[in-house]
């Protein structure tokens, strides 16, 4: 079996993570048993088993991921030039083809293999992520429990100091002794501290040893949980990279196999172009010619629309040039019956200082120029439209 660089890195990180998960599960089980023994008086501690659950979840997730990648992976990507196997790439039978024989139907029945592989891969990723999250939570909880156990140990297991004792005092004298005290009184008070220590050790020695072991186990559990978080995320990235590279190799192999099948066996080496591709290319050419730029119907610069609005046709000009002209006045004109009508322009009253017939305003206000439909004909000076 040939391993790539990505596959080797993913396998190495997965093996390290599996060893770390199993070690964390063992340490978590030991911490759970010690915490259950220390639950009563005088410590009143709880059993922290975060490493145990995270180790089990990570081991189960790695097993599912390995089964999905190793056992079901080679069926998804057939080799280039080989016959299509019972997976992806099985061509559909044409319309006029005869029915398949029982042997061929048995070969085609292996199509649900990739589906089950994908389901197994998704299940493995889900369990794996649950293990990583539980490892993160276990690292936080175990770190807090370590500080709590340290306080419990210093309170219950360490012997109490004498009220007047200090670390810098002389071994033959006590700081609280009077200046005139006898020198023989100091040796008589010294054996009192060993008697108190021996009395404390005989009462709680077993519990204190268990508490110290529990603290060491919690420290190891915190370290293993942190390693599980880091190695878990690294392994997930490496497995994802390996899976994507494997899918790319499979697609490249199927593409080379398709080119090899499309090339004629005894020809000159040129690829035979199927009629479907020629028809598709012809449709692309026609679509490109059809999508050439056409002049817009609302374009003012279109040369074909110069004769759309004849002189006097205000309705036709307004239909094609709705926004090309702004008339700031009202043009009054007479129709054939002699009635006064409004032909185009703004429906407000005539603005002060504006005369539609004043040619000097056309240069200053080009938007006030009359459209061609409102320009009177030379022989019809009495009509505005």
Curated annotation (Swiss-Prot):
Disulfide bonds: none annotated. Residues 163-197, 259-277 have a biased composition (Low complexity). The chain crosses the membrane at residues 9-29, 50-70, 121-141, 219-239. Residues 246-258, 278-292 have a biased composition (Basic residues). GO terms for cellular component: membrane. Keywords: Membrane, Transmembrane, Transmembrane helix. This is Transmembrane protein 271. The gene is TMEM271.
